[in-house]
């Protein structure tokens, strides 16, 4: 059976056009950091039994007070902000005078590629943050009583200069005139980071459950 070449070309063009019109659109993933995400999986417990975990990660847009320069730095590092299993509102982005009284300083936990880092941003130097601690997202996990799924147990908070002066364990800090950073593993340990003349002191302050 012979067919006119022009007819064949027309039929092929019609098939290609129909395919182009009916093909489903390619899926589009949301831009990085624009939506809340869950990091989940299983880890081995102390007795070797697998335990499930689920860590909530909030986008930077959940923290509208963050200065744009800091948002840019965190975005470059592909950061999302991990939330503790106790969180009732966005947390783990804090503000205070961490190197001088009244300074416009910030600190944030940044989760990226399975690792969380505690960054501090000093006023006037937002483009050169300091990393105080970095560890796997799953290093510190915990849960509320009665819950079987673990969540992040890493939380940070601002400790004011007045709170520092009221605590006897900070006596070796010679001059307390500005804020510090509480760096806690919930219900277990608490480290207080204090910038003393450009050097960060890490002071163990006992169990977080005592504060």
Per-range role (PLM):
Residues 1-11:
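Bacterial N-terminal signal peptides that target proteins for export
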Residues 9-19:
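Bacterial N-terminal signal peptides
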Residues 20-61, 137-211:
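Acidic, small-residue rich beta-repeat scaffolds with periodic aromatic anchors
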Residues 58-87:
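Short, non-transmembrane alpha-helical segments in secretory-pathway proteins
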Residues 93-101:
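Acidic, divalent-cation-chelating loop motifs in proteins
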Residues 100-110, 173, 177-181:
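Acidic/hydrophobic-patterned starts of short beta strands in beta-sheet-rich repeat architectures
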Residues 114-120, 190-192:
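Structural motif
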Residues 123-128:
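Short edge-strand/loop segments of extracellular domains
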